[in-house]
Amino acid sequence: MQRPGPFSTLYGRVLAPLPGRAGGAASGGGGNSWDLPGSHVRLPGRAQSGTRGGAGNTSTSCGDSNSICPAPSTMSKAEEAKKLAGRAAVENHVRNNQVLGIGSGSTIVHAVQRIAERVKQENLNLVCIPTSFQARQLILQYGLTLSDLDRHPEIDLAIDGADEVDADLNLIKGGGGCLTQEKIVAGYASRFIVIADFRKDSKNLGDQWHKGIPIEVIPMAYVPVSRAVSQKFGGVVELRMAVNKAGPVVTDNGNFILDWKFDRVHKWSEVNTAIKMIPGVVDTGLFINMAERVYFGMQDGSVNMREKPFC
């Protein structure tokens, strides 16, 4: 009998949506708008009519003042750009006999498609470690070999998307609520490669991505954590609410997500460390000094690669 995968204990609790459905860990927005007395956490109103994908990229209503909604032609170019970035990363980095970390979100789909093509064409022997329920389903859908960190604690290469990338290759991730498992897989990988479209390329974090930095928290601590973050660093902290269910988004780990909308550029390494020290915080969506290379699919059909100076 096959041993249960790393997320099997979560399925009975319905902590993640079924593929293709919104809600749970994959949704944002929704609910009514009010402030909790005596706290700095705000429960947002229905700012988005769309739903969040598995991670990384999101679909939002153009009525949301915090969202970036390009014209349809730009959106189609963005999807093509994701495909170009994903395929470039797979061609340049995936080799036979590797253990791969598979990220979450819409961009990673294109990378997995190309991995599956190469497995079939070149008879590659690859093992894939998922970062979320969505990633697990994607691995199975394309007939790739699924494993976990129990059996493969050392990962050769992790590929994932990002919500935003700054000039130093620091990332904001977690738009789809999978930030903790994404960071675990990236952290145990010998190489961490990021794929994104041209909209995610920024000089400073917050230039393009206006939904804030996700923070995964233990449910009982979301109010004191929200107060601590806003008092120490300013900005607004919101509890992420689900769309197709009543109440907050619940991660694959059974936790809540706070979105910290910061109001200035910070020293992100120091901020990341300080927030993680707050009791009740599981992890943040700040990926500092983790990405080795980032592939950006561009509007003109090219791929722009940026890497750390020492690589």
UniProtKB/Swiss-Prot annotation:
Cross-referenced InterPro entries: NagB/RpiA_transferase-like, Ribose5P_isomerase_typA_subgr, Ribose5P_isomerase_type_A
Q: What is its EC number?
A: 5.3.1.6
Q: Which Pfam families match?
A: Rib_5-P_isom_A (PF06026)
Q: Which organism is it from?
A: Homo sapiens
Keyword presence, Isomerase: yes
What pathway does the UniProt record associate with this protein? Carbohydrate degradation; pentose phosphate pathway; D-ribose 5-phosphate from D-ribulose 5-phosphate (non-oxidative stage): step 1/1
By what name is this protein known? Ribose-5-phosphate isomerase
Which residue intervals are annotated with compositional bias (Polar residues) in the record? Answer: 57-67
Top-level division of the source organism's lineage = Eukaryota
Report the top EC class in one word: isomerase
For this record, the Gene Ontology CC terms, alphabetical, are: cytoplasm; cytosol; mitochondrion
Task performed by this protein: Catalyzes the reversible conversion of ribose-5-phosphate to ribulose 5-phosphate and participates in the first step of the non-oxidative branch of the pentose phosphate pathway.
Which reactions are catalysed by this chain? aldehydo-D-ribose 5-phosphate = D-ribulose 5-phosphate
Q: Where is the composition biased (Gly residues)?
A: 22-32
Residues that bear Phosphoserine: 106
Protein family membership: Belongs to the ribose 5-phosphate isomerase family.
Recorded name of the encoding gene = RPIA
Phosphoprotein as a keyword? yes
**Residues found modified as Omega-N-methylarginine:** 52
Matches recorded under NCBIfam families = PRK00702.1, rpiA
Disordered: where is this region? 22-67
Query: What UniProt keywords are attached to this protein's entry?
Result: Disease variant, Isomerase, Methylation, Neuropathy, Phosphoprotein
